[in-house]
Amino acid sequence: EDIELIALSHFHPDHSAELPAILWPSGSQARLSGPTGDAGFPSVAEFLERLFGKNGAFPVFADRVQFDVLTVDTASRDIVDVWNVSDFLVRGIGVPHANVPTIGYRVDVGDASIAFSSDQNGSDPSFIEFIQDVDVLVIHMTVGEDASGFGADLHAKPSVWGQMATQGEVGRVLVSHISTPSPQVLQTRLGVLRDNYSGPVTVGEDLLCLEVN
């Protein structure tokens, strides 16, 4: 009942598979945002229909939840107001994640701001403009500096994250979506990040609370 908005970035399973479990206890109405589709991936409206429609995977939702859906055109790179209530503003923009339609988000609440990179390779300078001067940038530390091929097309290297944070003049970087189980590998990647960004870096963990001001 406390969830006002579910902002979906893209439709890889690790970013969308838990949606039925999140919505199951609440019922009634759900406000969601998500990407446009393409030949390989559904739009947010198509995704919801395939999951919750009368002929979907969970047809029990068809009469249980009413969806209020906003679609962000990820191909245009235009900034879209996703939710604007009082002093709470959520905006989305398309970001480059290989061939996957993907949204990065920015949340401004009063004077505080947080940006969520989502999965992306960091090749579009419009995202740096989008995150300018945020208090916290949440990044996905998924590949190392030696990434190549399709992996590098999907995900930004640690040096790229650092350069983006520096150019965006962000107040703090919060590292999430950590793919390696090795503490040594993680420290190496964090070292490259810090070589390219001089601000504070926090490594995310379950139940972490971070003050934003």
Annotate each PLM feature.
Residues 117:
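Short hydrophobic beta-strand that contains or immediately precedes a catalytic carboxylate
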Residues 113, 121-208:
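Cap/insert and terminal regions of metallo-dependent hydrolase folds
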Residues 1-114, 191-194, 200-212:
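Binuclear metal-dependent hydrolase catalytic cores
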